[in-house]
């Protein structure tokens, strides 16, 4: 799962450098910036943009620049070709480019368009001009004003259409340190506005499930605990606070992944049956008749070749006598369970 940050010239070089350092530590490889923000007056883009580009280059972060022919002069360049020399690898194009020009630019850069405004006619024109859509990206807007954002359902519909063509998809969630002038967060999806902490990270996971390839923090920064979670997304390993019973502590701190043929009822560990150092127990029937959401189950010897397999209940299940109850996911982390599926990773940690 890929994540990104947003950098604003009005924040100042030092603040941006601090955010880039946090992003690099978390494993982020994308940043978005714009040269067309009305509130950013008095910025020496020729100097500041080059400093920002150098900062991102050293951190191995791809900078996506929102540019137009009119903004080239702000950077002190004459042609788009010169942007590549500055280290810009993605350019967001909104207006002023015909299909032939767009396809030509896509041979030098990844070209990025507003995801909500790409039409069937645009697609046809680019195809006729010889477009390779793996060089194209669709970036959703963020929406500073309340009640102007999209629904998650609408985002998923747009993404499914463009992803099928080969487009890379970008979207935004709000940060926790807001940007003015409204200070209401910068999400793509309206229902994500105002979220923070783990709920914000779960919003990012919802956007990945809606076919987003990279999810950016729209505002300038997030808290330290959220940065930690962002690092987990980049490593494809969600940490789950867990209480394990005696004899099952061996399950702590092991990387596991849900099977690609994901079950709607349980998270099914691919790795657990392969651990050579893991004990396999006889059945120890529980007095419980059901397993609640977040129950951690380990198959006993009575399951034959499935012995040792770990699963996590996604909801209330009838408990099989051949399964031993090893512990539970702590209540505060159970909201992550719907997003752990189809090869996504997890790790049990102590509360």
Task: Please identify what each model-predicted range represents.
Residues 1-7, 56, 175-185:
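N-terminal small/glycine-rich loop or linker at the start of catalytic domains
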Residues 3-135:
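Active-site beta->alpha loop and helix N-cap motifs at the rims of alpha/beta catalytic domains
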Residues 6, 139, 313:
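Residues in well-ordered beta-strands of folded domains
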Residues 8-9, 24-27, 76-87, 106-119, ...:
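Short secondary-structure transition/capping segments
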Residues 65-82, 98-103, 132, 150-157, ...:
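Electropositive, surface-exposed helix/loop patches at the edges of structured domains
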Residues 116-246:
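Catalytic alpha/beta core domains of metabolic enzymes, predominantly
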Residues 245-351:
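C-terminal functional modules
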């Amino acid at each position: 799962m890929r994540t990104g940050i947003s950098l604003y010239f009005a924040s100042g070089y030092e603040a941006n450098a601090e955010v880039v350092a946090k992003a690099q530590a978390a494993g982020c490889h994308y940043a978005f910036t714009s040269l067309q923000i009305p509130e950013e007056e008095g910025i020496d883009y020729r100097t500041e943009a080059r400093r920002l580009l150098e900062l991102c280059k050293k951190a191995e972060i791809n900078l996506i620049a929102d540019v137009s022919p009119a903004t080239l002069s702000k950077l002190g360049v004459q042609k788009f070709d010169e942007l590549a020399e500055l280290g810009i690898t993605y350019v967001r194009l909104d207006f002023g480019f015909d299909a032939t020009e767009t396809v030509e630019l896509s041979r030098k850069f990844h070209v990025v368009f507003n995801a909500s405004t790409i039409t069937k006619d645009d697609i046809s024109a680019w195809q006729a001009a010889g477009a390779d859509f793996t060089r194209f990206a669709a970036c959703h807007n963020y929406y500073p004003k309340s009640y102007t954002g999209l629904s998650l359902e609408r985002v998923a519909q747009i993404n499914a259409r463009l992803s099928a063509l080969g487009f890379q998809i970008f979207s935004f969630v709000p940060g926790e340190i807001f940007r003015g002038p409204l200070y209401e967060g910068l999400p793509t999806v309206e229902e994500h506005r105002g979220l923070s902490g783990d709920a914000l990270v779960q919003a990012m996971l919802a956007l990945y499930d809606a076919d987003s390839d990279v999810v950016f923090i729209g505002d300038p920064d997030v808290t330290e605990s959220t940065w930690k979670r962002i690092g987990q997304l980049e490593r494809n390993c969600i940490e789950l606070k867990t209480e394990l019973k005696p004899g099952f502590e061996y399950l702590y701190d092991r990387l596991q992944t849900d099977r690609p043929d994901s079950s709607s009822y349980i998270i099914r560990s691919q790795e657990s049956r392969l651990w050579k150092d893991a004990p396999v127990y006889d059945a120890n029937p529980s007095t419980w008749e059901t397993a609640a959401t977040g129950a951690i189950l380990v198959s006993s010897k009575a399951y034959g070749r499935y012995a040792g397999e770990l699963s996590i209940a996604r909801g209330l299940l009838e408990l099989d006598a051949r399964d031993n109850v090893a512990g539970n996911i702590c209540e505060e982390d159970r909201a992550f369970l719907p997003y752990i599926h189809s090869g996504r990773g997890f790790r049990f940690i102590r509360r």
